[in-house]
């Protein structure tokens, strides 16, 4: 036994020595990969900011919010008034909104808000229904804008969207009211004396940041019609919350030191002042959303471009459709939340192709969230499939600014190519899929 133990000990020493030798290399490799990741993140992030035109989107959202904020708050508070338990919390909810989301310089705005919201309680039934529709339209616009950032081309189904918006308008105030009720009880019964009172004072200073952080986190996790990883959403929420707190301090400094709005607009300065603050808020929200999207997609976007092909986009479209079709044939359809294709095709590109297939009615989503082929692939030819590819999916990014000045010159040539392609590709898609399946077997 002693003789056999010596070789084992020697082997262990050799393995240990090799591992110790490899550790610095592994750490260096990981550090280099992390460095490369952050090197690509910022250009990709800035590119998305320009491409999605967030300054224009923030202005559009700010204008609609300015028109909808009073109806939205009126609907929120009216939902709480339905429940007698929450009736006493309306004041706390107003305090919560103004202390956490509106700068301290907005006391005049608060007075106007209270007057406007007080008048909405006397609105008749039809007027109340109109307020509810306006509030729903604001949520719908927010949903559509954030999904545009995530490149979601297939919108939610009308019933699914209405259910989501209805839940936000009804259960949202109830959850906020319950949270405020529970926190108020603990706040005024537990944190009243001694060290706990000092802790209470410290917690108050962090409360606005924590509230902003949780709001952004839920927004980035739940609104996009895509699976967003928690670390990515949390990173973007932290950045957005920090930007939001800095924006509040800058806004207070600007309003208190430079009374530009009062000099220009006089008595009605509260309106442009509110619009300016809402615009800054939406700019922060969209910037955080772009950061969350960039963190999750920067690696897939940095994949080396494939060589230009005669039929750009068709191979990828055929691959995604084939994956969905084979999974359906095997009796285990692909779920909408899972990655459809693995390999060189990035998750973002695959999601865009799935959205395209959903829009064109080639596939549809079942009530269980599964992707199923809708079209008759024995009638659909390869040319029909090729015709579904939009221009932005077919071209490379370096051709985004390409301007076809010779469209008239190449009109006849394009017609000849189309006829040739139509004749050559007059092959049922199902036959090709069956052939590729047999080759895989």
Curated annotation (Swiss-Prot):
Keyword Nucleotide-binding: no
Keyword Cell membrane in annotation: yes
Protein's membrane topology: Multi-pass membrane protein
One protein family per Pfam: Virul_fac_BrkB
Compartments, record wording: Cell inner membrane
Cysteines paired by S-S bonds: none
Cellular component terms per the entry's GO annotation: plasma membrane
Transmembrane segments: 54-74, 122-142, 161-181, 203-223, 233-253, 266-286
Keywords: Cell inner membrane, Cell membrane, Membrane, Transmembrane, Transmembrane helix
Similarity annotation: Belongs to the UPF0761 family.
NCBIfam families registered for this protein in UniProt: yihY_not_rbn
Protein name: UPF0761 membrane protein Clim_1521
Organism: Chlorobium limicola (strain DSM 245 / NBRC 103803 / 6330)
């Amino acid at each position: 036994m002693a003789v056999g133990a010596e070789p084992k000990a020697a082997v262990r020493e050799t393995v240990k020595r090799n591992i110790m030798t490899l550790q610095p290399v592994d750490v260096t490799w990981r550090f280099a990969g992390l460095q490369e990741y952050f090197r690509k993140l910022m250009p990709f992030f800035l590119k998305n900011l320009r491409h999605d035109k967030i300054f224009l989107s923030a202005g559009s959202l700010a204008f609609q919010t300015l028109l909808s904020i009073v109806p939205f708050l009126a609907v929120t508070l009216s939902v709480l008034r339905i429940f007698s338990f929450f009736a006493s919390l309306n004041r706390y909810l107003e305090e919560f909104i103004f202390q956490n989301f509106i700068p301290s310089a907005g006391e005049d705005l608060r007075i106007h808000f209270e007057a406007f919201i007080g008048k909405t309680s006397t609105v008749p039934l039809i007027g109340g229904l109109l307020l509810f529709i306006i509030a729903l339209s604001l949520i719908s616009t927010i949903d559509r804008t954030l999904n545009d950032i995530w490149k979601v081309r297939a919108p939610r189904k009308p019933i699914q969207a209405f259910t989501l918006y209805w839940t936000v308008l009804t259960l949202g105030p109830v959850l906020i009211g319950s949270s405020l009720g529970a926190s108020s009880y603990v706040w005024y019964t537990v944190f009243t004396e001694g060290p706990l009172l000092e802790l209470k004072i410290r917690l108050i200073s962090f409360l606005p940041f924590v509230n902003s952080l949780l709001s952004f986190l839920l927004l980035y996790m739940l609104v996009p019609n895509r699976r967003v990883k928690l670390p990515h959403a949390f990173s973007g929420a932290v950045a957005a919350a920090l930007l939001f707190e800095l924006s509040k301090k800058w806004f207070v400094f600007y309003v208190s030191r430079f009374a530009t709005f009062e000099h220009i607009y006089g008595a009605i300065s509260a309106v442009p002042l509110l619009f300016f603050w809402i615009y800054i808020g939406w700019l922060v929200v969209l910037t955080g959303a772009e950061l969350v999207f960039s963190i999750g997609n920067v690696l897939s976007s940095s994949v080396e471009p494939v060589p230009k092909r005669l039929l750009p986009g068709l191979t990828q479209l055929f691959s995604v459709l084939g994956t969905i079709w084979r999974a359906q044939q095997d009796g285990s359809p692909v779920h909408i939340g899972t990655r459809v294709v693995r390999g060189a095709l990035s998750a973002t590109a695959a999601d865009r192709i799935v959205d395209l297939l959903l829009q064109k009615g080639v596939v549809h989503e079942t009530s269980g969230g599964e992707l199923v082929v809708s079209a008759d692939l024995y009638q659909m030819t390869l040319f029909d499939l090729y015709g579904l590819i939009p221009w932005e999916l077919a071209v490379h990014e370096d051709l985004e600014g390409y301007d076809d000045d010779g469209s008239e010159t190449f009109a006849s040539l394009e017609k000849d190519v189309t006829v040739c392609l139509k004749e050559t590709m007059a092959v049922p898609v199902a036959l090709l899929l069956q052939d590729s399946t047999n080759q895989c077997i």
